[in-house]
Amino acid sequence: MDRSPTSRRRRSLLKGAGAAAALGVAGFPAIIRAQSDAIRIGHLTPRTGFLGPLGEYAVMGVNLAVDEINAAGGIMGRKLDLIAEDSVNPQTASTKAERLIERDKVVAIIGEISSASGLAIAQVAQRNRTLFFNTGCNSDELRGKSCNRYMFHTEAANSMYVSACGQALLRDGMVKGKKWYSLTADYAFGHDLLKVAKRFMTANGGEFAADELVATDVADFSPYMLKIRNAKPDLVVSNLAGAQITNF
């Protein structure tokens, strides 16, 4: 479900800062001792495409965290060397994750916003036995059947957000006997979020009047607005992402 622009900006900054800070407490001394002077880590996040605006905030956050850690003397006396890449899409994310590990010899990868790209990176990390800190992917699948021992999460799952928002809506009488109309981003994150939201509605006596999958490159929401007006739902639910939210 959608969150305010201020909240999204704050979360994006915290995601990057939290991820780099996590490296400071994670330890893995055996890996650190095997490296040269600096501790090299990779950061993958979309900086172009419909998630690009969110990615820019993630970049600001991780740069801030790395600068603060290095200014304080680094980790165990060693500075962090950050290598950042634009992940763009799942295929590119997978390719760049492989390159960061094999060519750049990073000890860990942090980042992502796209759940589909996060899954691709997680598979590469598992195959290469490299740590992956997920700082922005919300899909429950990444914490369930697709989770692995090399992946750690600093961001909440879709089910957590649905439960929190849902309890507030239950309190205000906006669930039982009500009809919702959802617009959902047509990729892994959106599909997962819609599934969780439907499960919540079914369990609490509500229903969806309709649910529309929206392509990630859609800029004109006029046709959807007309459908919503005709459906007369009690609540419109935005399961959109990135530039979709602004355009809607």
Where are these regions (language model features)?
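Short helix-capping segments at alpha-helix termini
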Residues: 69-76, 128-130, 147, 201-207
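Residue-level signal for short, function-critical loop segments
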Residues: 47, 88, 184-187
